[in-house]
């Protein structure tokens, strides 16, 4: 059972990118490897309930239970100790990854207030794309009334592309809303 975006990749994106970049083999075409969601919750050091709510939100958004991240060093100015839980993250692959990206591109990003597109400069030089979301309430799975606090999250999209141009062409072929 493949998702709508996965079928779209095989049927339309692969031939388009083969033509655009002059690939001879379909296996040369860049593809999505994983999507990593990270939610840093600094206030979790003082209140454990905040982290539980963040884990619940991330579970609803991603469809799988996130792992709780712990601090690596003690920082007195942030009032955290080594080993304290300070966030959560999850990695999506295969079907769940395509389902999440489909919801992100077609439902969630258009719900952002004053949305003009994501920056095309957020590539890391090796074909991976990073973006931040300021509010978790843009996702349809989150009930607006049940949210205790507005939290943002980081979204990292890892591809097999060698260059940023290939990765941008791949994401643009998925109808990713780039600003520039």
UniProtKB/Swiss-Prot annotation:
The encoding gene: rplE
Domain of life: Bacteria
One Gene Ontology CC term in the entry: ribosome
Keywords: Ribonucleoprotein, Ribosomal protein, RNA-binding, rRNA-binding, tRNA-binding
SUPFAM superfamilies, alphabetized: RL5-like
GO molecular function terms attached to this record: rRNA binding; structural constituent of ribosome; tRNA binding
Function of the protein: This is one of the proteins that bind and probably mediate the attachment of the 5S RNA into the large ribosomal subunit, where it forms part of the central protuberance. In the 70S ribosome it contacts protein S13 of the 30S subunit (bridge B1b), connecting the 2 subunits; this bridge is implicated in subunit movement. Contacts the P site tRNA; the 5S rRNA and some of its associated proteins might help stabilize positioning of ribosome-bound tRNAs.
Family classification: Belongs to the universal ribosomal protein uL5 family.
Protein name: Large ribosomal subunit protein uL5
GO BP terms in the entry: translation
InterPro entries associated with the record: Ribosomal_uL5, Ribosomal_uL5_bac-type, Ribosomal_uL5_C, Ribosomal_uL5_CS, Ribosomal_uL5_dom_sf, Ribosomal_uL5_N
Subunit structure: Part of the 50S ribosomal subunit; part of the 5S rRNA/L5/L18/L25 subcomplex. Contacts the 5S rRNA and the P site tRNA. Forms a bridge to the 30S subunit in the 70S ribosome.
């Amino acid at each position: 059972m493949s998702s709508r975006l996965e079928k779209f990749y095989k049927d339309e994106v692969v031939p388009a990118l083969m033509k655009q970049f002059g690939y001879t083999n379909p296996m040369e075409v860049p593809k999505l490897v994983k999507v990593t969601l990270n939610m840093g919750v600094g206030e979790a050091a003082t209140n454990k309930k905040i982290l539980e709510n963040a884990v619940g939100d991330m579970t609803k958004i991603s469809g799988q239970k996130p792992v709780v991240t712990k601090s690596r060093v003690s920082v007195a100015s942030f009032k955290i100790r080594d080993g304290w839980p300070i966030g959560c993250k999850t990695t999506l692959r295969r079907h769940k990854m395509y389902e999440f990206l489909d919801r992100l591109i077609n439902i969630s990003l258009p719900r952002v207030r004053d949305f003009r597109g994501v920056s095309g400069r957020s590539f890391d030089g090796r074909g991976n794309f990073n973006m931040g979301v300021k509010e978790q309430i843009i996702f349809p799975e989150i009930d607006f009334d049940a949210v205790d606090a507005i939290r943002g999250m980081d979204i990292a999209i890892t591809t097999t592309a060698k260059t940023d141009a290939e990765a941008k062409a791949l994401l643009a072929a998925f109808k990713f809303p780039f600003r520039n």
